[in-house]
């Protein structure tokens, strides 16, 4: 006869089996949790370590006191001196490089003091933020001299100036205005219209009506879609009526070739060209130029351009073809188009 296991022993075995299943489930959950943690640690460890709550890296006011920012020539744009964040000695250079370097309190999100705090701290996955006693040096592709001259050239006007090496992609100049001195912040900065948008990097995060530089897109479309584009002429009397819109021009250019119309930046000619090309063609070439795309500058996203091509009238299309109407283009996107 087959021997039967005593009831008490069977009960004990069932309990052991249940406990084994529970332990296995807990082990799987632990392994899954550790996997998620490790994935996030590798992806976001730098952000965790460079948090403003880390008093090893920030002072009591939340100012990063680790790392040095330098321009391409090794000129120090910002460093830590005696436990305090310091900036370049020249006030105009400080204003000209503010949106690239960043302010003391992280108001300018695209500044390297905020966006690349993990790199400035010397963080690495093995040693954390304690791998470098005084943080790391972060070299920018910018040249402080170019920024200085560009900021002065703006003459107090709001706007942005940027220069890049189209062969290497290095940004040599990136100025945004209005700006201010990070070591002497105006007390009424957030209420004063003079400083409206001072925290915004207009090169990366804004979009503007492009104006006549958009004619380069219209010109490209004309050369590739109008068979006689280089031999025919367009007449300019100072304005042209297209649909229900009067497209005005800066002068009276008379009969002119495409080359001459481009040299004159003639609104009348390019509005006629835009109407002939049609909205679908201009939309295609605008997208092909990348003017509706967002780009990444070392991980910093740019604003997207916007164009309203739907239900556009002939007159509105004429204005769009010369860079007016509702066209909005990000400066970085246009810089890439011109350098491409």
Question: What name fits each language-model region?
Answer:
Residues 73, 167-212, 217-340:
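Beta-lactam-recognizing serine transpeptidase/beta-lactamase-like catalytic domain environment
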